[in-house]
Amino acid sequence: MTVLDKNYLRLQFWNRIYQKSGTEFQSFFEDIMKKAFPDFQPIKPYGNKGDRGNDGYRPDNGIYYQVYSPENPSEKETEAAKKLKADFGKLKSSWDKISKIKEYYFVFNDKGQGVSIEIESALADLK
């Protein structure tokens, strides 16, 4: 693959990320993860119980993912930080006994804008 090919594919990838929000982005993320990691299991919400803070995980490795992709990420940074903490609490109380949490990833589609200090601070609080 040439450098030009790689740059074209990178541009296509960023274009897709930029265009997707909400469940459409989550489905895109799941498709990538299933191709990259055969053991990845997406979790669908169950009635009023939801997904209990887990949008997908790799059970053998204890690696969990929570996905959040608002339409306007810069307007939702405070909400994202609160969601990150709340969802990790749900994850810890519901999923840790199923597969011990070893790694946690909050997948925030910032649409290339960069992550705010609020989200970084919320992640630091979990450590």
Where are these regions (language model features)?
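Acidic metal-coordinating catalytic centers involved in nucleic-acid phosphodiester chemistry
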Residues: 89-127
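Globular "head" domains of long coiled-coil molecular machines
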Residues: 43-55
